[in-house]
Amino acid sequence: MKVYNTLTNKKEEFLTLVPGEVKMYVCGPTVYNFFHIGNARTFVVFDTIRRYLEYRGYKVKFIQNFTDIDDKMIKRANEEGSTVKELGDRFIKEYYKDADDLNIERATKNPRATEFMEEIIKFVSDLIEKGYAYEIDGDVYFSTKKFNSYGKLSGQNLEELQLGARINIDERKKDPMDFAIWKSQKPGEPAWESPWGMGRPGWHIECSCMAYNLLGETIDIHAGGSDLSFPHHENEIAQSEARTGKQFAKYWLHSAFVNVNNQKMSKSLNNFFTAREILEKYDADVLRMFMLSGHYRTQINFSMELLDSTKAALDRLYNSINNLENLLDEVKNEELRDEELEYKNELQKYKEKYIEKMDDDFNTADAISVIFDLIRDVNTNVTIESSKELVKYTLDLIRELGNPLGILQESTKASLEEEIEKLIEERQKARKEKNWALADKIRDNLKERGIVLEDTPQGVRWKQI
C-alpha cells in the first residue's frame, strides 16, 4: 500500500510503527456552528481511509478532536449570550447528529481540548524548560527560530515568512513568527489557572497535547484539510518534536477544498452550504459518493446539478442491487453449478482491481469505477437461471466493496418500503384536504415505478407489479 505523504511530497510505502496497527489523528471541528460541506469532505475522506485500513486488516485507533475553546467560540457565545461550554455542548451534539446521518463511523475517541487543561499546562511548561518557549506578561510563545526544521511540512521559508509577518507585529515577541501556546485572560473570557496566571491554551498546542496523550510520542497518520497544513500542522510538528525529540507523525495526509459552482465557498458569495442542508434533500450515499468521486488530494466542484448526476448514477447501482435481491427470492436453483464456479472465480478480479486502486493512495474515484464495472458484468450474467448461491455471492461482493466507501449498504427493499409508506401518508393527507390533484399525482408517480395502490376498508395497501 502506498500513501502520499505531504511531509515528503511523494508517495511512500505505508509501513506502520507497529505491524498491523495504525495510530491516526484527524483535526476535528471547532464546535461553534454546523459543519459545512467542505468540512464534510474532510470527515468523509478520513472516515473512508480509516474504514479501508480496517478492511485491509489493520487495527485502527482513530482520534478526532473537538476544539471547544477558541476565539471564534468566545465571539459566538458572547453574541448569543451563552457560555462557551454551553455552545460547545450544543454543537458537539449537532456534530454527532450530522456525522451519524452522513454514515461517518464514531471515532475511537473524540477528545475535547478543555478536558486536557492539566496536560496542556504541563506541555507548555516542558517547552519553556527546554528553551523552546518564553513567557511575557502571562502569554507564552513558541520560539520558531529555536526549532531548526520549522517549515519542513509546508515548504515555507522562515526568513520569507518573517518579512511577511512584520505587518501588525506584536513588539513583545522575540520574532514575528513566534506563536502563542498560552494566552493570558482577557475580560469576559473563560480561563484556567496556570504558572503564568489565568489564561487559556493556543489552538496549536491543543492538538499536539491530545495526540501525545492519547496516541503517544510518534503516530502513524496525522490528517486534516489542506488549509491546516500551515500554520496549524507546521506548528504542531514544531511543538511536539521540540518536546519529545522524536518524529511527531510518519505520514501527513491532507484533503483538498470543495469549490461551489467553480468559486470558493463563502458566506459573502451566498454559496455556503451546511452538510445538514444537503442531507435534507439527498441521501447520505449520494453526498458520500459525490465527495469520493474525485481523488481526495484534488479539489472538487460542488453544485446541485452534480449532486443530481451522482444520485442518478447511484440509483442505477441500487436498481441493480434491487434486482439481485428480487432474484434471491425468485431463483429455484439453490447450489452453485459447475459452470458457475468459474464465473464466480472470475468476479474476484474486480475485488483485486478495487484493492489495487485503493492501495494506491486511496483512489476512491477509480474504486467506484470498478464497482460500476462489476455491476455491469453481473447485470448481464446473473439471471433467473442462476443459483441462489451465486446471486447471494454477487450481492455480498457489491456490499463488501461499497462498505469502505460507506455506500451501498442499505437493503433496497427496506428503503423502498419506507419511501412508499411516506408517499402514501402524503397522499392520505392530500385526500383529507381534498387536494385531489396532488393525491392523483402521487398515485400516478408510484404507478410509473411499478407500485399499485389499493384503497381498502382496512387502509391503503400497495404492491409491486
Swiss-Prot record:
Residue numbers covered by motif 'KMSKS' region: 264-268
CDD domains: CysRS_core
Organism per entry: Clostridium botulinum (strain Langeland / NCTC 10281 / Type F)
GO CC annotations on file: cytosol
Co-factor remark: Binds 1 zinc ion per subunit.
Key words, A-Z: Aminoacyl-tRNA synthetase, ATP-binding, Cytoplasm, Ligase, Metal-binding, Nucleotide-binding, Protein biosynthesis, Zinc
Name of protein: Cysteine--tRNA ligase
Lineage: Bacteria, Bacillati, Bacillota, Clostridia, Eubacteriales
Binding-site list for Zn(2+): 27, 207, 232, 236
Subcellular localization: Cytoplasm
Pfam families documented for this protein: CysS_C, DALR_2, tRNA-synt_1e
EC numbers for this chain: 6.1.1.16
Binding site for ATP: 267
Motif placement: 'HIGH' region: 29-39
Gene expressing this chain: cysS
Alphabetized HAMAP family for the sequence: Cys_tRNA_synth
